[in-house]
Swiss-Prot record:
Taxonomic superkingdom: Bacteria
Family membership: Belongs to the ChdC family. Type 1 subfamily.
Recorded catalytic activity of this chain's protein: Fe-coproporphyrin III + 2 H2O2 + 2 H(+) = heme b + 2 CO2 + 4 H2O; Fe-coproporphyrin III + H2O2 + H(+) = harderoheme III + CO2 + 2 H2O; harderoheme III + H2O2 + H(+) = heme b + CO2 + 2 H2O
Protein name: Coproheme decarboxylase
Species lineage: Bacteria, Bacillati, Bacillota, Bacilli, Bacillales
Cofactor(s), names only, from the UniProt record: Fe-coproporphyrin III
Organism: Geobacillus sp. (strain WCH70)
Gene Ontology biological process: heme B biosynthetic process
Length: 248
């Protein structure tokens, strides 16, 4: 039997995608819409207070295309906190006009196809920064879920640890070419959601998503073993832009 890779696990993660019922939103009076926006921004302010204390993080992006209109990405120490945040959002007036489109539950993950050592990895500052990240404030985001193939001779889980380590090392070298252009956060979701991993890419240049994903398709680990779900691409929505975005 092949050896399972050990993982380092950090904050729990929720990607919450919503579509907006614009027709229903327009039926409110201007005062009602403004009150709903203020209530929502008050909730986001609480999220920001948590982030300022480095006890979690969040990002809000508008989504391009018809899969969704808005994405909330939330990081918290426990899965209960994610549930509480989702419930608090659902209790707002604005949520009456937010239609669930897609969601993804996972946990920030570093796999150790890493070198082993005597030091506790959870005490290494760089490892902690990656397991408990403050989300980048880039202009654009790209999220997609993925699996490793388990078909015929292309069964990732039948490969030896050394084979998997070598394939992932080559894959990582491709990713390093985009250092400074794209920031990647990998979240593990085996047993938590329908795919095995979620990949969230952040960049100030959306074209870099295409370039990175395309180049990685030629890595053997992706060409032979990668299977992908839907891609969601969006633009950052700051608190200052929320009233403009929701103006009708």
């Amino acid at each position: 039997m092949s050896e399972a890779a050990q993982t380092l696990d950090g904050w729990y993660c929720l990607h919450d995608f919503r579509s907006i019922d614009w027709s229903a939103w327009k039926t409110l009076t201007s005062d009602e819409r403004e009150a709903a926006i203020r209530e929502f921004l008050s909730l986001v302010e609480k999220w920001q207070e948590t982030e300022d204390k480095q006890e979690g993080s969040h990002a809000i992006y508008t989504i391009v295309g018809q899969k969704a209109d808005i994405m909330f990405m939330i990081l918290r120490p426990t899965i209960e906190e994610l549930n509480e945040i989702e419930t608090a959002l659902n209790k707002t007036k604005l949520a009456e006009f937010l239609v669930p489109a897609y969601s993804y539950v996972s946990v920030v993950e570093l796999s150790n196809y890493l070198a082993s050592g005597d030091e506790d990895p959870y005490q290494i500052p760089e490892v902690r920064r990656r397991l408990y990240p403050i989300l980048p404030k880039t202009k654009h985001v790209c999220f997609y879920p993925m699996d490793k193939r388990r078909q015929g001779n292309d069964n990732w889980y039948m490969l030896s640890m050394e084979e998997r380590r070598n394939l992932m090392r080559a894959h990582g070298l491709t990713g390093r070419k985009y250092a400074g252009k794209v920031t990647q956060i990998i979240t593990g979701s085996v047993g938590l959601d329908d795919f095995e991993w979620g990949v969230t890419l952040f960049s100030d240049d959306a074209l870099q998503f295409k370039k990175l994903v395309y180049e990685m398709r030629f890595d053997e680990v992706s060409a032979r073993y990668g299977e992908f779900g839907s891609f969601f691409v969006g633009n950052r929505l700051t608190v200052e832009k929320v009233p403009v975005f929701l103006h009708v």
